[in-house]
Amino acid sequence: MWGIGRRGKATVGDVDDALRALGWNVTWETTWQGLARTGRPGRVARLDRGWSTVWYRPAHGGSHAEGDVVRVRNIGADVAVGDWVVVSDDVERIEFVLPRQSAFMRRASFEGQRAEAHVIAANIDVVFLLHALVAPPNQRRLERELVLAFDSGAQPVLVLSKLDLMDNANEVERRMAALEAVAPGVDIHVVSGLRGDGVDALRRYAAGYRTVALLGASGVGKSTIVNTLVGGQVQSTAAVREGDQRGRHTTTAVQLVALPSDPVGAAGWLIDTPGVRAVSLWSSGTGIERAFTDVFELGEKCRFRDCKHDDEPGCAVQAAVQAGDLDARRLESMKRLVAEEAALEDEQKARLKVEDRRGFRKRKT
């Protein structure tokens, strides 16, 4: 029976086997023991309008044993799929959300509205960024996705889908090279969800009960890849428009999906998400620096440390642009992201000042 956690550093022997199969590890066990809380820890598998589906152990044969899954209210709890939470002893509510080790989030509000964070997936180890080979390479979108992925604390992996629809190997190489150019150092996989090409390589990222998240625009083939990874029909699929290769949302809710075991290791977990149209920045971390390592490395050679890479003398970045070693569009993209991040920081600071003045801001206890 779950009770008050013990203080101190946990060992492997302290980790419950059922929770371990959901991704629980020694780090989580140590955190749990240090909380000294009553209740029972579990993982959020799905959110539905104020309700959380929480798993205590993974599904067996596609269904849960009685008592292994509960549906509880999110009263006063800011939760996301993938979160580890503590459910009250009476199984009525979520009492506490354990501190996240990683979180993929973006700005949720539209222009003109107050900025709010939207956590898409929590406690993930890897983020699969899906782009369809049948569509023209969207370098600017990928750059934004990489910033968010690096800021999340997870490892970004670029997945190029719908290989089965490409009959020109040279065009595949060209489109792959275009996206690879703005993803230095990032793992890249070319796959066909329909035929299964390259899918086993993706499954290995989740081996050992790790959690991967799948993100991309509508129509890139997420649902087909999910079904192939899982080995069954988890999501419905839909055709895309031939004119612009845009698709319809076939995934309507974020959910945690079990991946089967394979010869290279234990099973893992996949967080499937609806198609993301707008990729807006939220957190201010090292994401831009890590997504634009090529630009920042050039910046280290500039004459002035505070060089803006405009028309300053001795600017190594502008020199690289003039020499054709750096795409001017990539530099402008980075500048836009830096400006967007700065504006967001200013907006957040201004809002906190107003909330402090009006007494609305939550105080730490």
Regions found by a protein language model. Name each.
Residues 89-94, 135, 218:
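Short, charged beta-turn/beta-strand-edge "cap" motif at the junction between a beta-strand
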Residues 222-238:
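A conserved segment at the C-terminal end of the G1
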Residues 155, 165-220:
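Canonical P-loop GTPase G-domain recognition
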Residues 1-19, 38, 59, 70, ...:
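Helix-rich effector regions associated with P-loop NTPase G domains
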Residues 50-54:
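Short aromatic-glycine-enriched beta-strand elements
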Residues 116-123, 129-182, 189:
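Phosphate-binding glycine-rich loops and their immediate beta-loop-alpha structural context
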Residues 37-48:
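Structural detector for short beta-strands of small beta-barrel domains
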